Regions:
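Catalytic-site signature of metal-activated, phosphate-bearing donor transferases
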Residues: 1-172, 183
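Alpha-helical transmembrane segments and their immediate juxtamembrane flanks
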Residues: 175-187
Length: 187
């Protein structure tokens, strides 16, 4: 019995479909039968999971075509950066025997991305890792083929956002504080 459907996400930025830079295809579980699925209890990068039954992957895409302004996008990612810092602090606490963070997902792509992020990316030195991630996404994953929009998106999402997260982690460590909350999205 099929209880879930995975779709291919097609991201648009400034009106352009981002076909490169590691953005396509992003496989996401987006449809599940009532009573057989749920959302992970995570602050960032949460996924829908199917609790029982089979999951199929459709050939069709769904469009993530947000036509809001760049200012809105930047505000949203500033807000996301607070959530990312909170999430990393919770993972650090879990490694020290405190609250655990669930590591399940129905998508193998999501499992691999999460593993690389938690055991690869976050094991690299702060700030340096943002440089490497941008180079990987823009040059090795061919983000430059998406034109000016691809360059802007990859710089902001793979470099600026990741550098901002590291700056906030650094600030918390320097002051000896924890991120209290993600705050309100001011868009």
């Amino acid at each position: 019995k099929v209880n879930g459907v995975i779709l291919r996400r097609r991201v648009y930025f400034m009106g352009r479909w981002l076909k490169h830079g590691g953005k396509y295809p992003e496989l996401l579980l987006r449809i599940f039968r009532v009573g057989h699925g749920m959302s992970e209890m995570k602050l960032m990068d949460e996924h829908l999971i199917v609790t029982d039954g089979n999951v199929v992957t459709f050939k069709n895409d769904f469009s993530d075509n947000n036509n809001k302004s760049l200012e809105w996008w930047i505000n949203k990612h500033n807000w996301y950066s607070n959530k990312e810092v909170l999430d990393q602090q919770m993972k650090s606490d879990a490694a020290n025997g405190e609250e655990s963070v669930e590591e399940t997902s129905t998508s193998m792509q999501a499992k691999v991305k999460r593993f690389v992020k938690n055991h690869g990316y976050y094991s690299l030195p702060k700030f340096f890792r943002a440089h490497l991630y941008f180079i990987y996404r823009y040059y090795f994953r061919l983000g430059f083929l998406d034109g000016t929009e691809g360059k802007i998106y990859t710089f902001l999402q793979a470099y600026w956002y990741r550098y901002l997260v590291d700056a906030k982690i650094y600030e918390c460590e320097k002051l000896g504080v924890k991120m209290k909350s993600q705050g309100d999205l001011k868009a």
